[in-house]
UniProtKB/Swiss-Prot annotation:
GO cellular component: plasma membrane
Gene3D superfamilies xrefs: Immunoglobulins
Top-level taxonomic group: Eukaryota
Species this chain originates from: Mus musculus (Mouse)
Signal peptide: 1-17
PANTHER family: CYTOKINE RECEPTOR, INTERLEUKIN 5 RECEPTOR SUBUNIT ALPHA
Keywords: Disulfide bond, Glycoprotein, Membrane, Receptor, Repeat, Signal, Transmembrane, Transmembrane helix
Compartment list: Membrane
Motif (Box 1 motif): 367-375
Glycosylation sites: N32, N128, N213, N241
S-S bridge residues: C131-C152, C179-C193, C266-C313
Protein name: Interleukin-5 receptor subunit alpha
Amino acid sequence: MVPVLLILVGALATLQADLLNHKKFLLLPPVNFTIKATGLAQVLLHWDPNPDQEQRHVDLEYHVKINAPQEDEYDTRKTESKCVTPLHEGFAASVRTILKSSHTTLASSWVSAELKAPPGSPGTSVTNLTCTTHTVVSSHTHLRPYQVSLRCTWLVGKDAPEDTQYFLYYRFGVLTEKCQEYSRDALNRNTACWFPRTFINSKGFEQLAVHINGSSKRAAIKPFDQLFSPLAIDQVNPPRNVTVEIESNSLYIQWEKPLSAFPDHCFNYELKIYNTKNGHIQKEKLIANKFISKIDDVSTYSIQVRAAVSSPCRMPGRWGEWSQPIYVGKERKSLVEWHLIVLPTAACFVLLIFSLICRVCHLWTRLFPPVPAPKSNIKDLPVVTEYEKPSNETKIEVVHCVEEVGFEVMGNSTF
Protein backbone atom coordinates (compact mmCIF):
# COMPACT_ATOMS: atom_id res chain seq x y z
CA MET A 1 0.00 0.00 0.00
CA VAL A 2 2.78 2.42 0.91
CA PRO A 3 4.60 2.02 -2.42
CA VAL A 4 1.35 2.76 -4.24
CA LEU A 5 0.85 6.01 -2.29
CA LEU A 6 4.42 7.06 -2.99
CA ILE A 7 3.88 6.42 -6.67
CA LEU A 8 0.70 8.53 -6.68
CA VAL A 9 2.38 11.43 -4.85
CA GLY A 10 5.29 11.30 -7.24
CA ALA A 11 2.97 11.26 -10.21
CA LEU A 12 1.03 14.26 -8.85
CA ALA A 13 4.23 16.21 -8.30
CA THR A 14 5.36 15.38 -11.82
CA LEU A 15 2.00 16.47 -13.20
CA GLN A 16 2.14 19.80 -11.35
CA ALA A 17 5.67 20.38 -12.56
CA ASP A 18 4.57 19.67 -16.12
CA LEU A 19 1.67 22.06 -15.76
CA LEU A 20 3.92 24.81 -14.48
CA ASN A 21 6.24 24.33 -17.39
CA HIS A 22 3.32 24.29 -19.80
CA LYS A 23 2.95 27.82 -21.11
CA LYS A 24 -0.70 27.33 -22.08
CA PHE A 25 -1.82 26.47 -18.51
CA LEU A 26 -3.33 29.65 -17.01
CA LEU A 27 -4.33 30.27 -13.41
CA LEU A 28 -7.42 32.41 -12.99
CA PRO A 29 -8.07 34.68 -9.98
CA PRO A 30 -10.79 33.91 -7.43
CA VAL A 31 -14.23 35.46 -7.79
CA ASN A 32 -16.81 36.99 -5.43
CA PHE A 33 -14.15 38.25 -3.01
CA THR A 34 -15.84 40.00 -0.04
CA ILE A 35 -14.81 41.40 3.35
CA LYS A 36 -17.40 41.44 6.13
CA ALA A 37 -17.14 42.61 9.75
CA THR A 38 -18.30 39.73 11.94
CA GLY A 39 -17.52 41.20 15.37
CA LEU A 40 -15.52 43.81 17.22
CA ALA A 41 -12.15 44.15 15.48
CA GLN A 42 -12.87 41.03 13.43
CA VAL A 43 -13.51 40.46 9.70
CA LEU A 44 -14.23 37.48 7.49
CA LEU A 45 -12.64 37.27 4.03
CA HIS A 46 -14.49 35.03 1.58
CA TRP A 47 -14.02 34.14 -2.09
CA ASP A 48 -14.94 31.43 -4.58
CA PRO A 49 -12.73 29.51 -6.97
CA ASN A 50 -12.94 30.74 -10.52
CA PRO A 51 -15.54 28.57 -12.29
CA ASP A 52 -13.60 28.91 -15.54
CA GLN A 53 -10.42 27.52 -14.02
CA GLU A 54 -9.15 24.49 -15.96
CA GLN A 55 -9.40 21.35 -13.82
CA ARG A 56 -6.42 19.03 -14.10
CA HIS A 57 -6.54 17.35 -10.68
CA VAL A 58 -4.07 19.76 -9.09
CA ASP A 59 -4.09 21.27 -5.61
CA LEU A 60 -4.73 24.98 -5.91
CA GLU A 61 -3.94 27.34 -3.04
CA TYR A 62 -4.62 30.99 -2.34
CA HIS A 63 -2.25 33.74 -1.38
CA VAL A 64 -3.88 36.36 0.88
CA LYS A 65 -2.32 39.78 1.35
CA ILE A 66 -3.56 42.26 4.00
CA ASN A 67 -2.93 45.81 2.78
CA ALA A 68 -4.40 47.85 5.68
CA PRO A 69 -4.39 48.69 8.51
CA GLN A 70 -1.22 46.59 8.91
CA GLU A 71 0.47 44.65 6.12
CA ASP A 72 0.54 40.87 6.34
CA GLU A 73 0.39 37.89 3.98
CA TYR A 74 -0.11 34.15 4.15
CA ASP A 75 -1.18 31.11 2.12
CA THR A 76 -4.28 28.97 2.64
CA ARG A 77 -6.11 26.11 0.95
CA LYS A 78 -9.48 27.36 2.19
CA THR A 79 -11.77 29.84 0.46
CA GLU A 80 -12.29 32.00 3.53
CA SER A 81 -10.13 33.49 6.24
CA LYS A 82 -10.80 35.24 9.55
CA CYS A 83 -8.71 38.25 10.60
CA VAL A 84 -8.58 39.97 13.98
CA THR A 85 -7.46 43.57 13.61
CA PRO A 86 -8.55 47.13 14.54
CA LEU A 87 -11.13 48.40 12.07
CA HIS A 88 -11.44 52.10 12.96
CA GLU A 89 -9.08 52.96 10.08
CA GLY A 90 -10.71 50.58 7.62
CA PHE A 91 -9.51 47.27 6.17
CA ALA A 92 -8.22 46.27 2.74
CA ALA A 93 -6.97 42.94 1.37
CA SER A 94 -6.18 41.09 -1.85
CA VAL A 95 -6.17 37.42 -2.85
CA ARG A 96 -4.88 35.38 -5.80
CA THR A 97 -4.73 31.76 -6.89
CA ILE A 98 -1.36 29.98 -6.71
CA LEU A 99 0.04 26.61 -7.72
CA LYS A 100 3.24 25.51 -6.02
CA SER A 101 5.91 23.05 -7.07
CA SER A 102 9.35 22.19 -5.79
CA HIS A 103 10.96 24.59 -8.23
CA THR A 104 8.60 27.49 -8.81
CA THR A 105 5.17 28.98 -8.08
CA LEU A 106 2.54 29.88 -10.62
CA ALA A 107 0.17 32.71 -9.59
CA SER A 108 -2.90 34.41 -10.99
CA SER A 109 -3.65 38.11 -10.94
CA TRP A 110 -4.88 39.80 -7.75
CA VAL A 111 -8.46 40.58 -6.77
CA SER A 112 -9.04 43.15 -4.01
CA ALA A 113 -11.73 44.34 -1.63
CA GLU A 114 -11.97 46.81 1.21
CA LEU A 115 -13.99 47.77 4.25
CA LYS A 116 -14.20 51.54 4.58
CA ALA A 117 -13.36 53.28 7.84
CA PRO A 118 -16.42 54.17 9.97
CA PRO A 119 -17.47 57.84 9.81
CA GLY A 120 -16.41 60.35 12.45
CA SER A 121 -14.73 63.70 12.91
CA PRO A 122 -10.92 63.64 13.30
CA GLY A 123 -9.68 64.12 16.86
CA THR A 124 -12.91 62.96 18.50
CA SER A 125 -11.95 59.34 19.24
CA VAL A 126 -10.46 58.36 22.59
CA THR A 127 -6.69 58.28 23.16
CA ASN A 128 -4.32 56.51 25.55
CA LEU A 129 -6.55 53.48 26.03
CA THR A 130 -5.10 51.11 28.67
CA CYS A 131 -6.61 47.97 30.20
CA THR A 132 -5.69 45.60 33.03
CA THR A 133 -7.20 42.36 34.29
CA HIS A 134 -7.29 40.69 37.73
CA THR A 135 -8.37 37.23 38.81
CA VAL A 136 -11.35 37.28 41.19
CA VAL A 137 -13.46 34.68 42.94
CA SER A 138 -16.34 33.53 40.77
CA SER A 139 -19.93 34.03 41.85
CA HIS A 140 -20.60 30.45 40.65
CA THR A 141 -17.80 28.61 42.41
CA HIS A 142 -19.22 25.15 41.69
CA LEU A 143 -18.95 25.72 37.93
CA ARG A 144 -15.97 28.02 37.61
CA PRO A 145 -14.05 28.96 40.77
CA TYR A 146 -12.24 31.93 39.20
CA GLN A 147 -13.19 34.75 36.86
CA VAL A 148 -11.37 37.76 35.47
CA SER A 149 -12.19 41.42 36.13
CA LEU A 150 -11.40 44.11 33.56
CA ARG A 151 -10.66 47.80 34.00
CA CYS A 152 -9.97 50.21 31.12
CA THR A 153 -9.14 53.92 31.16
CA TRP A 154 -8.78 56.47 28.36
CA LEU A 155 -8.50 60.16 27.58
CA VAL A 156 -11.12 62.25 25.81
CA GLY A 157 -10.30 63.15 22.20
CA LYS A 158 -8.62 66.55 21.89
CA ASP A 159 -11.30 67.82 19.50
CA ALA A 160 -14.28 66.07 21.10
CA PRO A 161 -17.16 68.43 22.07
CA GLU A 162 -17.97 68.91 25.74
CA ASP A 163 -21.20 66.92 25.40
CA THR A 164 -19.37 63.84 24.07
CA GLN A 165 -20.20 60.56 25.76
CA TYR A 166 -18.19 57.38 25.22
CA PHE A 167 -19.29 53.74 25.46
CA LEU A 168 -17.02 50.70 25.77
CA TYR A 169 -17.45 47.12 24.56
CA TYR A 170 -15.10 44.17 24.73
CA ARG A 171 -15.00 40.89 22.82
CA PHE A 172 -13.20 37.71 23.83
CA GLY A 173 -13.74 34.79 21.48
CA VAL A 174 -17.36 34.81 20.38
CA LEU A 175 -18.64 36.65 23.47
CA THR A 176 -19.22 40.42 23.48
CA GLU A 177 -20.20 42.54 26.48
CA LYS A 178 -21.07 46.21 27.00
CA CYS A 179 -19.75 48.18 29.97
CA GLN A 180 -22.26 49.13 32.67
CA GLU A 181 -20.00 50.78 35.28
CA TYR A 182 -18.19 53.98 34.29
CA SER A 183 -16.05 56.63 35.94
CA ARG A 184 -16.55 60.21 34.73
CA ASP A 185 -14.57 63.44 34.47
CA ALA A 186 -15.60 66.94 35.59
CA LEU A 187 -17.80 67.32 32.48
CA ASN A 188 -19.58 64.02 33.24
CA ARG A 189 -17.90 62.23 30.31
CA ASN A 190 -17.05 58.55 30.64
CA THR A 191 -13.27 58.09 31.01
CA ALA A 192 -12.98 54.64 32.62
CA CYS A 193 -14.88 51.36 32.67
CA TRP A 194 -15.02 48.51 35.19
CA PHE A 195 -16.21 44.92 34.64
CA PRO A 196 -16.28 43.10 38.00
CA ARG A 197 -16.47 39.76 36.15
CA THR A 198 -15.94 38.90 32.49
CA PHE A 199 -15.72 35.96 30.08
CA ILE A 200 -11.97 36.50 29.61
CA ASN A 201 -9.76 33.45 30.14
CA SER A 202 -6.46 34.46 31.74
CA LYS A 203 -4.89 31.23 30.47
CA GLY A 204 -6.05 31.77 26.90
CA PHE A 205 -3.99 32.95 23.94
CA GLU A 206 -6.81 34.73 22.11
CA GLN A 207 -6.60 38.47 21.84
CA LEU A 208 -8.94 40.75 23.75
CA ALA A 209 -10.69 43.27 21.50
CA VAL A 210 -11.83 46.57 23.04
CA HIS A 211 -14.07 48.95 21.10
CA ILE A 212 -15.10 52.47 22.17
CA ASN A 213 -17.61 54.56 20.25
CA GLY A 214 -19.33 57.79 21.22
CA SER A 215 -22.14 60.23 20.64
CA SER A 216 -22.51 64.00 20.57
CA LYS A 217 -25.05 66.54 19.32
CA ARG A 218 -22.28 68.69 17.85
CA ALA A 219 -20.13 66.19 15.92
CA ALA A 220 -19.88 62.58 14.77
CA ILE A 221 -17.60 60.76 17.20
CA LYS A 222 -15.08 58.46 15.53
CA PRO A 223 -14.87 54.96 17.08
CA PHE A 224 -11.63 53.35 18.24
CA ASP A 225 -10.47 49.71 18.40
CA GLN A 226 -7.51 48.19 20.21
CA LEU A 227 -6.29 44.62 20.74
CA PHE A 228 -4.71 43.40 23.97
CA SER A 229 -2.92 40.20 24.86
CA PRO A 230 -4.44 38.80 28.09
CA LEU A 231 -0.94 37.81 29.13
CA ALA A 232 0.40 41.36 28.75
CA ILE A 233 -2.38 43.06 30.74
CA ASP A 234 -2.88 40.42 33.44
CA GLN A 235 -2.07 41.94 36.85
CA VAL A 236 -1.19 39.03 39.14
CA ASN A 237 -2.71 39.34 42.60
CA PRO A 238 -0.36 39.60 45.60
CA PRO A 239 0.44 36.41 47.55
CA ARG A 240 -2.00 35.61 50.33
CA ASN A 241 -1.62 34.92 54.05
CA VAL A 242 1.92 36.21 54.44
CA THR A 243 3.21 35.26 57.91
CA VAL A 244 6.43 36.37 59.59
CA GLU A 245 7.99 35.00 62.77
CA ILE A 246 11.19 35.87 64.63
CA GLU A 247 13.18 33.28 66.55
CA SER A 248 16.44 34.50 68.06
CA ASN A 249 18.20 36.26 65.14
CA SER A 250 16.29 34.44 62.38
CA LEU A 251 13.35 35.70 60.34
CA TYR A 252 10.90 33.01 59.11
CA ILE A 253 8.64 34.13 56.21
CA GLN A 254 5.92 32.06 54.54
CA TRP A 255 3.00 32.76 52.18
CA GLU A 256 0.39 31.17 49.90
CA LYS A 257 0.00 31.51 46.14
CA PRO A 258 -2.04 34.43 44.78
CA LEU A 259 -5.72 34.14 43.99
CA SER A 260 -5.42 32.60 40.52
CA ALA A 261 -6.59 29.80 38.26
CA PHE A 262 -2.96 28.65 37.97
CA PRO A 263 -1.71 25.98 40.42
CA ASP A 264 1.09 26.43 42.98
CA HIS A 265 3.99 25.37 40.73
CA CYS A 266 3.17 28.09 38.17
CA PHE A 267 4.52 31.01 40.22
CA ASN A 268 7.82 32.72 40.83
CA TYR A 269 8.16 35.07 43.80
CA GLU A 270 10.15 38.14 44.74
CA LEU A 271 10.69 38.90 48.42
CA LYS A 272 11.63 42.35 49.76
CA ILE A 273 13.01 42.82 53.30
CA TYR A 274 13.46 46.49 54.23
CA ASN A 275 15.45 47.55 57.30
CA THR A 276 13.67 50.71 58.47
CA LYS A 277 16.60 51.68 60.67
CA ASN A 278 19.45 51.86 58.15
CA GLY A 279 17.43 51.82 54.90
CA HIS A 280 18.97 48.58 53.60
CA ILE A 281 16.79 46.59 51.15
CA GLN A 282 17.25 42.86 50.59
CA LYS A 283 15.54 41.31 47.54
CA GLU A 284 15.33 37.59 46.80
CA LYS A 285 13.99 35.78 43.69
CA LEU A 286 12.36 32.52 44.79
CA ILE A 287 10.47 29.50 43.51
CA ALA A 288 9.43 28.21 46.93
CA ASN A 289 6.89 29.99 49.12
CA LYS A 290 9.10 30.30 52.21
CA PHE A 291 12.34 31.98 53.20
CA ILE A 292 14.65 32.27 56.24
CA SER A 293 16.91 35.28 56.80
CA LYS A 294 19.36 36.36 59.49
CA ILE A 295 18.61 39.69 61.16
CA ASP A 296 19.85 41.80 64.06
CA ASP A 297 17.82 42.44 67.20
CA VAL A 298 17.99 46.24 67.18
CA SER A 299 16.00 47.01 63.98
CA THR A 300 12.46 46.97 62.62
CA TYR A 301 11.83 45.22 59.28
CA SER A 302 9.16 45.62 56.59
CA ILE A 303 8.30 42.43 54.65
CA GLN A 304 6.58 42.33 51.21
CA VAL A 305 6.12 39.62 48.55
CA ARG A 306 4.93 39.67 44.93
CA ALA A 307 4.40 36.98 42.29
CA ALA A 308 4.59 36.33 38.55
CA VAL A 309 3.38 33.42 36.44
CA SER A 310 6.34 31.27 35.37
CA SER A 311 7.18 29.93 31.90
CA PRO A 312 6.12 26.27 32.39
CA CYS A 313 2.48 27.40 32.59
CA ARG A 314 2.42 30.23 30.04
CA MET A 315 4.68 32.89 28.57
CA PRO A 316 6.35 34.78 31.44
CA GLY A 317 4.41 37.89 32.39
CA ARG A 318 5.17 40.95 34.45
CA TRP A 319 5.40 41.02 38.22
CA GLY A 320 2.17 41.48 40.14
CA GLU A 321 1.37 43.84 42.98
CA TRP A 322 3.29 43.80 46.28
CA SER A 323 1.55 42.41 49.33
CA GLN A 324 0.75 44.78 52.18
CA PRO A 325 3.88 45.43 54.30
CA ILE A 326 4.25 43.50 57.55
CA TYR A 327 6.41 45.14 60.24
CA VAL A 328 8.36 43.00 62.70
CA GLY A 329 11.08 43.62 65.29
CA LYS A 330 11.58 46.37 67.83
CA GLU A 331 14.01 49.13 67.05
CA ARG A 332 16.44 49.49 69.94
CA LYS A 333 19.54 51.59 70.52
CA SER A 334 22.91 49.86 70.52
CA LEU A 335 25.16 50.00 73.64
CA VAL A 336 27.41 52.70 72.18
CA GLU A 337 24.38 54.82 71.25
CA TRP A 338 23.00 54.41 74.76
CA HIS A 339 26.33 55.57 76.25
CA LEU A 340 26.40 58.61 73.98
CA ILE A 341 22.90 59.55 75.13
CA VAL A 342 22.86 58.50 78.80
CA LEU A 343 26.26 59.83 79.96
CA PRO A 344 25.80 63.47 78.84
CA THR A 345 22.23 63.42 80.16
CA ALA A 346 23.33 62.06 83.53
CA ALA A 347 26.14 64.61 83.79
CA CYS A 348 23.75 67.47 83.09
CA PHE A 349 21.29 66.09 85.64
CA VAL A 350 23.98 65.83 88.38
CA LEU A 351 25.18 69.37 87.72
CA LEU A 352 21.61 70.65 87.91
CA ILE A 353 20.96 68.90 91.25
CA PHE A 354 24.25 70.15 92.69
CA SER A 355 23.44 73.70 91.60
CA LEU A 356 20.01 73.55 93.28
CA ILE A 357 21.48 72.18 96.52
CA CYS A 358 24.09 74.92 96.59
CA ARG A 359 21.44 77.56 96.04
CA VAL A 360 19.12 76.25 98.75
CA CYS A 361 21.82 75.71 101.40
CA HIS A 362 23.82 78.86 100.55
CA LEU A 363 26.88 76.72 99.97
CA TRP A 364 28.23 79.15 97.42
CA THR A 365 28.35 81.89 100.10
CA ARG A 366 30.06 79.59 102.58
CA LEU A 367 32.50 78.12 100.11
CA PHE A 368 33.22 81.40 98.38
CA PRO A 369 32.59 84.31 100.86
CA PRO A 370 32.59 87.80 99.34
CA VAL A 371 35.81 89.86 99.69
CA PRO A 372 35.19 93.03 101.88
CA ALA A 373 35.76 96.37 100.19
CA PRO A 374 38.55 98.65 101.71
CA LYS A 375 37.30 101.37 104.14
CA SER A 376 37.87 104.98 102.99
CA ASN A 377 37.91 107.86 105.63
CA ILE A 378 37.76 110.45 102.94
CA LYS A 379 34.08 109.84 102.56
CA ASP A 380 33.55 110.89 106.20
CA LEU A 381 35.06 114.36 105.71
CA PRO A 382 32.44 117.10 105.43
CA VAL A 383 33.00 119.21 102.41
CA VAL A 384 31.67 122.73 102.13
CA THR A 385 31.61 124.40 98.83
CA GLU A 386 31.20 128.15 98.41
CA TYR A 387 30.50 129.88 95.19
CA GLU A 388 31.29 133.50 94.40
CA LYS A 389 29.76 135.42 91.65
CA PRO A 390 32.36 135.55 88.98
CA SER A 391 33.19 138.51 86.79
CA ASN A 392 32.53 138.49 83.15
CA GLU A 393 36.03 137.18 82.41
CA THR A 394 36.81 134.95 85.40
CA LYS A 395 34.96 132.26 87.36
CA ILE A 396 36.42 131.45 90.80
CA GLU A 397 35.44 128.45 92.93
CA VAL A 398 36.57 128.45 96.57
CA VAL A 399 36.65 125.21 98.54
CA HIS A 400 37.27 125.24 102.31
CA CYS A 401 38.13 122.09 104.15
CA VAL A 402 37.27 122.30 107.85
CA GLU A 403 39.38 120.21 110.12
CA GLU A 404 37.60 118.31 112.84
CA VAL A 405 39.05 116.98 115.96
CA GLY A 406 41.36 114.08 115.32
CA PHE A 407 41.83 114.80 111.60
CA GLU A 408 44.57 116.52 109.72
CA VAL A 409 43.69 119.58 107.65
CA MET A 410 44.01 118.63 104.02
CA GLY A 411 44.47 122.20 102.79
CA ASN A 412 42.74 124.72 100.62
CA SER A 413 42.51 124.71 96.92
CA THR A 414 41.61 127.63 94.75
CA PHE A 415 40.91 127.38 91.00
